[in-house]
Amino acid sequence: MTTMYVSRVSTRPLSAQSAAQLSKAVAFFAQSYRLSSNACTAPTPSRRAFTSASKIQVKGRDLFPEPEHGQIKRTEPAWPHPPYTAEQMRSKVYFAHRKPRDFSDRVALGMVRFLRWCTDFATGYKHNVEAPKKASDSNALTATKPYQMSERKWLIRYVFLESVAGVPGMVAGMLRHLRSLRGLKRDNGWIETLLEEAYNERMHLLTFLKMYEPGIFMRTMILGAQGVFFNSFFLCYLFSPRTCHRFVGYLEEEAVLTYTLSIQDLENGHLPKWADPDFKAPDLAVEYWGMPEGNRSMRDLLYYIRADEAKHREVNHTLGNLKQDEDPNPFVSEYGKERGEKPGKGIESLKPVGWERDEVI
């Protein structure tokens, strides 16, 4: 005969704390079981050619979440963005090209075309149009190639371009700042505009990073491109600031063209994810540009960014027309009330190919 020994079991009811711990343990093991079951049946994601990014619009992890501070609730931008109206962004902003007038201009244009080719190759950019039919009509586009772009490809191009576009203003502003210090003289207002331009381009980049997460390969490309471009622009600006400003003016022409083509793609129905009414501009963009309620779609965001690029085009073509060591910055200068159109921070009197020196000095 076998004798069985049974341990004593307490007949007292569980305390509230013990019951809570037991329920948490049961829930944890149940969730783990569901996750392991799903992992066995989930399809394997396909590989991507250019980047290891995992999403087009960020829904989970934020690349740069706002830090949690006990006392600081909000930090205002150092350079508040000037207001743009929808009418201004649609009627005053369009693709335009300034024809080179001397050897310096031709060198700048040649360098931009080479950089454009390198960027197209690096980002796999292939579009179904070459350019707008005429400079004054941003919507007159004729397809000449099969359509090969998508929301993801456009975001790849945006992120790569904006990561480079923020370099010239910072380099030029830094060099002029240092020259003002060692020369013991004023800079005539150029530094602020150049640094504000770099800040604005960085805001473009941060906005797109709210919608797209680059992979390690693209991050490596950005690192290499920034190193090469920063040092090259640094040396060129020491040698010929005028050529560098003309270079940036031509570079911004390409940026205006890029955003014009992407807006046209969106309006023609080639980018359905961005046309979805539920796809809204990130809060970062809404606050920076002051986007009004009802005008916060991806299309509206691209119009704002294109207007910024058109402004940089005007500023740098104008600075390229001035005497680099003598003339004041016309975009922060005050003019008489009797003057009609005049340069400023907004796009009310936007000149696509820049102001000539005799118009502003």
UniProtKB/Swiss-Prot annotation:
Annotated keywords: Electron transport, Iron, Membrane, Metal-binding, Mitochondrion, Mitochondrion inner membrane, Oxidoreductase, Respiratory chain, Transit peptide, Transmembrane, Transmembrane helix, Transport
Cofactor note: Binds 2 iron ions per subunit.
TM regions (residue ranges): 155-175, 221-241
Necessary cofactors: Fe cation
GO biological process terms held by the UniProt record: alternative respiration
Entry's EC annotation: 1.-.-.-
Covalent S-S links between cysteines: none
Compartment(s) where it occurs, according to its Swiss-Prot or TrEMBL record: Mitochondrion inner membrane
Topology term for the membrane: Multi-pass membrane protein
Main location: mitochondrion
List of residues binding Fe cation: E162, E201, H204, E253, E309, H312
Record GO terms (molecular function): alternative oxidase activity; metal ion binding
Keyword match Membrane: yes
Family: Belongs to the alternative oxidase family.
Name of this protein: Alternative oxidase, mitochondrial
Originating species: Botryotinia fuckeliana (Noble rot fungus)
Classification lineage: Eukaryota, Fungi, Dikarya, Ascomycota, Pezizomycotina
Gene name of the record: aox
